[in-house]
């Protein structure tokens, strides 16, 4: 399986994402610059965290116009796994690949610390390695992680089981309905504010994020013929 890690000007979690795939999973991965216009050679696309284009206007507002985003949309439409973490989630929202919007944290401060999440839906290509209701520890690092959508959209998210992760216990940023991560209706585009790529080694505090990346690989292997 081959992963693409998209790098925008200002991305700063791309190396962590690369490490999770290459060193922890042993899968093939490649950095892709923001002006790339073809992602057909990849099986999954990862949009890392950071401060793309300095977060000017809004987080992700400029990055969504990058040349690579047309290729990201094409990958999503083809059913390939697309994961956006933190700033990557914000970019997916701005690009219309996921519903809703992101606001400043309720306390108007940047928050960087581990949080607990509840796995709300374990029947997705991103969460099959988890148990339903499993509580996991994943770090956050954001100033604009307060997810919001209108009432009708929230009803659809709940009805379609598109809410994949919720904050467990304390809600750190005021996010609507404690939402920490959602998928699109097709189930192949996931956006989440916590950083699973920073939770792949127990020595560093948690390895709970590794199951997310393993879920993607397991899904791909189950749906593709792998030859030696």
From Swiss-Prot:
It holds the Pfam family GATase_5. It catalyses: N(2)-formyl-N(1)-(5-phospho-beta-D-ribosyl)glycinamide + L-glutamine + ATP + H2O = 2-formamido-N(1)-(5-O-phospho-beta-D-ribosyl)acetamidine + L-glutamate + ADP + phosphate + H(+); L-glutamine + H2O = L-glutamate + NH4(+). Gene3D superfamilies: 3.40.50.880. Pathway: Purine metabolism; IMP biosynthesis via de novo pathway; 5-amino-1-(5-phospho-D-ribosyl)imidazole from N(2)-formyl-N(1)-(5-phospho-D-ribosyl)glycinamide: step 1/2. InterPro entries: Class_I_gatase-like, PRibForGlyAmidine_synth_PurQ. Keywords: ATP-binding, Cytoplasm, Glutamine amidotransferase, Hydrolase, Ligase, Nucleotide-binding, Purine biosynthesis. Its EC number is 6.3.5.3, 3.5.1.2. One of its GO terms (molecular function) is ATP binding. Residues 4-226 form the Glutamine amidotransferase type-1 domain. Signal peptide: none annotated. One of its GO terms (cellular component) is cytoplasm. It is found in: Cytoplasm. The active site is at residues 86, 195, 197. GO terms for biological process: 'de novo' IMP biosynthetic process. Part of the FGAM synthase complex composed of 1 PurL, 1 PurQ and 2 PurS subunits. NCBIfam families: FGAM_synth_I, PRK03619.1. Part of the phosphoribosylformylglycinamidine synthase complex involved in the purines biosynthetic pathway. Catalyzes the ATP-dependent conversion of formylglycinamide ribonucleotide (FGAR) and glutamine to yield formylglycinamidine ribonucleotide (FGAM) and glutamate. The FGAM synthase complex is composed of three subunits. PurQ produces an ammonia molecule by converting glutamine to glutamate. PurL transfers the ammonia molecule to FGAR to form FGAM in an ATP-dependent manner. This is Phosphoribosylformylglycinamidine synthase subunit PurQ. The gene is purQ.
């Amino acid at each position: 399986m081959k992963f693409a890690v998209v790098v925008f000007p200002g991305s700063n979690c791309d190396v962590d994402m690369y490490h999770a795939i290459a060193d922890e999973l042993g899968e093939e991965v490649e950095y892709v610059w923001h002006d790339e216009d073809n992602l057909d050679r990849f099986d999954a696309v990862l949009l890392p965290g950071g401060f793309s284009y300095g977060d000017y206007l809004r987080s992700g507002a400029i990055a969504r116009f990058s040349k690579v985003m047309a290729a990201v949309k094409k990958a999503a439409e083809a059913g390939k796994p697309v994961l956006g973490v933190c700033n990557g989630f914000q970019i997916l929202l701005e690009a219309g690949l996921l519903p809703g919007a992101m606001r400043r944290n309720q306390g108007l401060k940047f928050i960087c610390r581990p949080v607990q999440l509840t796995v709300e839906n374990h029947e997705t290509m991103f969460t099959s390695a988890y148990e339903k209701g499993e509580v996991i520890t994943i770090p956050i690092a954001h100033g604009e992680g307060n997810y919001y959508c209108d009432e009708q959209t929230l009803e659809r998210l709940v009805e379609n089981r598109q809410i994949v992760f919720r904050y467990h216990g304390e809600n750190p940023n005021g996010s609507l309905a404690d939402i920490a991560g959602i998928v699109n209706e097709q189930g192949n585009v996931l956006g989440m504010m916590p950083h699973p790529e920073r939770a792949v080694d127990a020595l560093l505090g948690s390895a709970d994020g590794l199951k997310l990346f393993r879920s993607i690989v397991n899904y791909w292997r189950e749906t593709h013929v792998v030859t030696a």
